[in-house]
Amino acid sequence: MRTQGQQISDRLTVEVDCHSLGPADCPSMTSSFSPLESPTPTPTSLYSHGSLTSPSWHEAGHYHSLPMERRPSGTPLRNAFRVTDFPSADPMGMQVGTMERPDQLPVSSEYLSGYDDINDQLWIPHDSIPKTFEHPTFPYQAPMPQYHHTMGRNHYYRPQAHTAYLPESASNPCLSRPMFSRHDGLSHSASMSNMLPWMTAPESLAPQTITPQQAFPGAGPVTPPSSNYSDFPASLQTFKPHTPSTPVRSLSLGTPRSDTPQSRMSGHYDYSEEYPVSPVYRDGHLIRTHRQPSRKPSKKQLVRSNLSLEKLPPIIKQVQFKCKEPGCKGRFKRQEHLKRHMKSHSKEKPHVCWVPGCHRAFSRSDNLNAHYTKTHSKRGGRNRYVATLDETSPDYDPEFRGQLTPDGRPIYGSKLEDLADCDLSVDGWED
């Protein structure tokens, strides 16, 4: 066994008690391997809190890059894992071994299901254990595991079981302290190698080496940043946000347009209204494109070009029938309308009002009927009221011809010739 005086900050000692065998039979059972190379990336602080009982160990006959040999034996072994008291690099100066932890954990088929026979001896060569990350400033930094597709029998990957025991600072390398230290002695490629497995799902990509130039093209060499956040790598500013190049049309008019692919897709070739195209961003630069006026005339222009005074039909047609009386400007569309108008200019008025005291004559019968309804059917007018011409009166009888009472009611049985004072002179007639 190694002494506790040695500064072994990344070793986990495996002690195997062989009570039934002699010391010469199992000289190589006491060995040490790095927990950083285990399939579960568990930091030192995780083992100090008694979380060793839960990691899912490989159920195959070998670890990746860690060969094992099986030596059959007839005597059963009582194997146990023991966490030794090794100093931690925590700034608080706390010893890991002084914290509460299980002293012994029996190794059974539950943890090493690849070994069905518990009588076999587990031997790990001391020279085959890789020695990585022995720098004293990386007590909590653990490389992300690289899972190979050539696993042994009964092995399957359980990602939820691994992430349940990892704190946020261990699973996310961007939050660990050594990445922001300028004295850590690591280059930018080493930091990027720890970030890339965390950024990519392990089950979706095969293990491969990705350089920073392949992951971030055009960024150039970047030096490790300092502890303050103001000196963050300037290469992140080279990443430009992606903006859609599809133009958005506005409703303003009067802007010239050009024959662009966007205009071909829109299909607005037959209109003269111009729609400006929104700015297009290409490689982070603003590119303004304007449309030029199309040469094809629009529909409105074609309609306006056909409108002229010579081609327009007359709004009012020329009236063919005119009144021939001098001084009369009567115009009529029909011949019968002109004949009826000509009767108004003649001296013949055969249609005379029968109301006693009126005796007004008209050349047309329709004019006489209008005279009855407008003048004699209303009370309080300057003409005499006749109840037989009023539609609202109970004595309404448009066919009555006879004598009337002073209030305009009819006197049935009387005749118009019986009136002695009836004046039928022509002077009383009105045109």
From Swiss-Prot:
Positions of the UniProt region annotated as Disordered: 29-51, 211-275, 287-306, 390-412
Cell compartment(s), UniProt: Nucleus
Paired cysteines (S-S): none
An annotated GO BP: conidium formation
Keywords from the named record: Activator, Conidiation, DNA-binding, Metal-binding, Nucleus, Repeat, Sporulation, Transcription, Transcription regulation, Zinc, Zinc-finger
Species of the source: Penicillium oxalicum (strain 114-2 / CGMCC 5302)
Any Pfam family hit: zf-C2H2
Function: BrlA, abaA and wetA are pivotal regulators of conidiophore development and conidium maturation. They act individually and together to regulate their own expression and that of numerous other sporulation-specific genes. Binds promoters of target genes at brlA response elements (BREs) containing the conserved sequence 5'-(C/A)(A/G)AGGG(G/A)-3'. Regulates the expression levels of seven secondary metabolism gene clusters including a down-regulated cluster putatively involved in the biosynthesis of the mycotoxins roquefortine C and meleagrin. Negatively regulates the expression of cellulase genes.
Lineage: Eukaryota, Fungi, Dikarya, Ascomycota, Pezizomycotina
GO cellular component terms given for this protein: chromatin; nucleus; transcription regulator complex
Protein name, as recorded: C2H2 type master regulator of conidiophore development brlA
Biased composition (Polar residues): 225-265
Segments of skewed composition (Basic residues): 287-302
ZnF C2H2-type: positions: 321-345, 351-376
PANTHER family: TRANSCRIPTIONAL REPRESSOR PROTEIN YY (PTHR14003), YY2 TRANSCRIPTION FACTOR (PTHR14003:SF19)
